[in-house]
Structures are given as C-alpha cells and as structure tokens.
C-alpha cells in the first residue's frame, strides 16, 4: 500500500466492483455467488484501506477532499451491507454498488489536498468538525439509500397502478432478471419500511451534524447570523426531512408521497455537497 | 390385447352433457357398478371383451381406459362405445359426443392428458393427481392388470418428463395464484394481513384457499345471507383452514375495511358494492396503509375509479386475466416440445406392448425344446435335479438367439409374419399347450418374459408404492 497513493488505492475496490458486475451481467445463476463474493471482497478491501490509512495518518488524514469522498463511499457500503443483511433485499446491493463505485472514481479524481484545520480550529473544534463530517456523511448515506429506494418505489408503484409491465410469473431465476425485469422482492410495503428506517436513523444524525456545523460556523466566523448558501440549503434539506418525519409519525404519511419527499430531500443534499466540495469550496464558507 | 380409450371432454361435449356423464359415475360406488357392467360385456362366443379397466373422471372429462381381450377386434370397440353412449344418454347420436382411441393413439392421448396438454388450461397440475386416483381406484377394484399398470406408469413418467423438460408448468395461470402473487408485490408478508372476502363464489373460495396456503391467518367472509356464508365455509374449507376464517354480517363489512389489507370481491351483485366515496374515508382511517382490492365478480362489484386513490390498488378479473394470457402463450409454445415427448413415450409403450405378442410363442417354444430334451436325456440321466439343470441350461443356450429375434419381430411390424412362420415350423398351438399336460408354471414364465420385455423389473413394487 505504501507504494501507492491514496487515489490509486481507491481504484482497487472500484475495479473489483466493476468486475463483479460483469459476472452479474452474464445472467448465469452460478455466477451470482461470484458477484456477491466480489462485492463483499471490494467492501473488505475498502475497509482495510480505510483502517490502514487511518492508522498511518490519523484523523487529520481524513481532512482531504478525496478522503472524504472515499469515506462517504465506505459509509454507503456499510449501510448497504447492513440493509442487505437485515432485509434480504438483493436489489439494494445491485443498485447501490454502482453509486459506491462512482464515488470511488470521484475520490480518485478529487483534489488530494489537505484542509488545514489546525490553523483555524482549536483541538476541541477539530473533534467537533470530525464528528460533524462523520455524522453528516452517515446521514447522507442513509438518505442516498432512501433516495434509491424511493425511486424503486415510485417505479414499482406505477407499474402496479397502471397494471403494465408487471411480470408476475416469469421464473428466469436469476437475480439480475428478478431485479430488473420482474421486480422480485420489490414489494411496496418493504420499500416503504426501509425508506422510513433510513429517515428514522438518518434524521437525528443529520440534525446533530447540522447543529455541530452551526456551532463550528459560529466558532469560525464568531457569529450565528452570517448566512451562507450551504447553511440555507442544509436547513432547507433538514426542514424537508423534518416535515417528512413529522408527517410519517403524526399523520401516517407513507407510500408515493413519502417517496417523493425523500427524493426531493436527497436532491437538495446532492446540490449542497456538489456546491460545497466540487464546484465552489468557498460556498461552504471557507477556502 | 388392444388399448382402447373411450371418453368425452370439454373438447367434444358441452358442460351439460359432461354433467350427465359425471353424475352417473360421481361416486366410487357408481363407478364400480358401471365398471362391473363394462367388464361383463361379452362377444358372440360369450367371452369377456374387456380384460382391464380404469375410469377417469374430472370436471372436464370422463374417460374409460381399457385393455381389450385378445379376441376383441375393431367391431367390438364400436360395440363398447355404443354401450357406453347408451348407458349415459337416451338421445340418438349421443355417441358423437364420445371419442375413441385405439392402441398408439390411445397411449398418446392418455400421455397427453397426464401431461396436461389436453387440459382446458394447458399445464395445470391437478390432472396428474386425478389420473393417479383413477389408477388407484382401478387397483382397488382389482380391474387393473399388466398392460394398464404399464400404461399408467408410463403416463406418470411421461407427465413428469414433460413438466421437468419443458416450461409448460413454469408459468402458473390461475386467477387465485395471480391474486396472491400481486399481493406479494404490495405487501411484505401476508402472515399478518387481514383479508375480507365478499361473497361466496367458487373463485373467491379458491383464492381464499390460496391465501391461506401462503400464510394468511385472518380471513373474514361476508355474504348477504349469513347462513349461506356459514354453509360455504363448512363445505369448502378444511379443519385447519376454518381456524383462519370468521364469518361476519354483511352489514358489518364496512366497519372492517379500515383494518383489512386485502378485499376479495366475488358477489353476484349487479351494482357496485364498494364505491369511490366509501373508500376515501377508509384510507384516511388506515393512515395511508396500502389497500389491495381484487374484484373477481362479473359484473364488477368495485367502482374502477377507486384505483385512482393513492395507496389503493384495484385489480378486476380482466386485469388479472391479461397477466395470465401471457403465460398461456408461453405454455402453448411449449406444448409443441411436450407433444414430441408424448409421442416418443407412446412409441416406447407400444413397442413394449407389441413385444407381449411374442410371449406365448416363446413359452411354447421353450416348452417344446424342453420336452424334447427331457425325453432324450431321460435315457441317460436318472437323477431329476441334475437332469433339470442340464435341460434348463441347454434350453437357454439353444433358444437365446431365436428368442431375441422373436422379440424383435414382435415389435417390428414389417416382420409380423415371423411369429406365424415359427408357429407353423415348430407346430406350436396356443390352444393345445395345456391340454398336452404341460404344468410348468407357464404364467411364471410369461411374467418373466414380460418383465424382460418391459425392461422394468420393479413394476410390481411401483404398483404397490402407488397403492
């Protein structure tokens, strides 16, 4: 590992994920296990990279843009693996792994620049910043999952509602066909339940993360009142998820409307992250 | 020794005529009574026409599967058909309702029926069980024999091959199955779901049964006449199934809607039982939990507008029917491959059956050779045990090749004259064998030859298994 840069390391799990999809596309049942094994191998390698790098560089090593993107991919993968284990919904793994792979590729191309936080934050604030990043990323990963699940929900709900392209019985018996052609396992109740779980776990994390962000902003700019675009988008996102959670708990909102809420919320997250990290770093409030 | 099938099905007769036949052979007692009459049919020489018999009766067909006596010829087959037709129908021309298949065509027909190629819904699995029942009943009434045993086992084997080697049964096509599969697209687990069945139709019953099979524990049945609903439950469901069912007043079903997840509607009502305005408040009370409505009644009993309500999914019989249509197409495509398998199996069966024609000749030939050897060897060997051993050994060695050729000749129709030539050459007369005092367990020899011919030594044990 020491002969490779961090960016090159990200390509190892990336290529494993891409390679694994070749086995899935072969549409042979015996190759499905190879696909699953490769996905888990990719995840284990991702985890090894994370822990070894953490051991070598410490937490300050995490304060680079590429590392944050890599970390985000790792968190998404943990969430996906856990959901796959709990809900036995193979389509989650099939749909989300490409997003993880894209994240790893972005990590490779992202600037390998460390953000010097020592000069601007105290030790305590550095810990707060790290926690802020971790919480926001875990929350965002859960919302990313909710976003994909919501898309599947809307797609599947439409098929059931209009009664078209709904294959009930075509037993091709391969997960690729089951997922993409038959929508096997896509029952609306489970999709809605998973969406709700993502919201229930993700919302408190995002809330704490945003609160920490506001605290850090105050610490950095010595005022709560300086309104930056990232804060507006973050608060708007938070508000959408807060309304969604409230409606779900108090009024029993579920189904298509809940899915639409999740999609809108995540699109706002994507826009805030893209703006803050890739397009305009100053958008976040710092250079 | 000919196989004869006479019967009527949905293809040859309408439901009214099928009902007439079905009613007269509805119970095992009625069938046994009719079977006795058939087995007592005699030819002009007062010899029984039918050796073995099985009666197959399902909702779509009634068939009489027979193995005729060796002396029965084509004329007798028509006589049997006329007798069957006259037994069930008084009207003239009723024999046109019945079809008749002989030998290869009969075997092919039975194998097609067993493989569900001749069913109203191609590929449906029930028919094989019904054929097994018919065979078991034939065994029970002791009307079966070597030929029908082989014929039925070959039919079971053929049906199994068709199901495993083609996709004929891979796409289920029943409304009840489709309803359950659709439910699985909406709900994660059916075990905790509540189902409301409105009406007591046949389709509703089948669907309710299918839901119970898939783990549903709570089914409420409401009918305008509560007594009829109670009677329906009593008549239609088994003990375990009844534990999952509650009969409620029809006036109370609306109160149950907010707690129900699936509604199955199969009433005979001419108007809508569930309207758009009825469901709107229910959905609010349900806190937007999905509601699946299945309307299998004609005319429809659920307002189609209801499908526009969010989290409500309404499927009527046409919607489900369209999904099944695709599967029927798949099955029809597979039927071609399946027919080839049926034909191959029917040919194999006929080869085996034809080989039986050689058995009496083989037995006579063996006896003849043994007799000659016994007379000649008795002059030189006194000890019986040693003599018998030598006689058997020599008979086997002398006749091994001729017997192989005789068996081949029996199967091959182009060499049909060989058996006759053989009889003439060795002066073999079927009628005089026993009169000449041969008591050598001819039946045992015949059985051994048959087993060799069929290549199926486990035939008897298989019969026991099925019994």
Whereabouts are the PLM-identified features?
Chain A
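Hydrophobic cores of alpha-helical transmembrane segments in multi-pass integral membrane proteins
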Residues: 3-116, 136-155, 168-181, 191-216, ...
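Interhelical loops and loop-helix junctions of multi-pass membrane transporters/channels
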Residues: 116-129
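Membrane-interfacial segments
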Residues: 155-165, 219-224, 284
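Short hydrophobic "helix-edge" motifs at membrane interfaces and signal-peptide entry regions
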Residues: 54-55, 121-123, 218-219
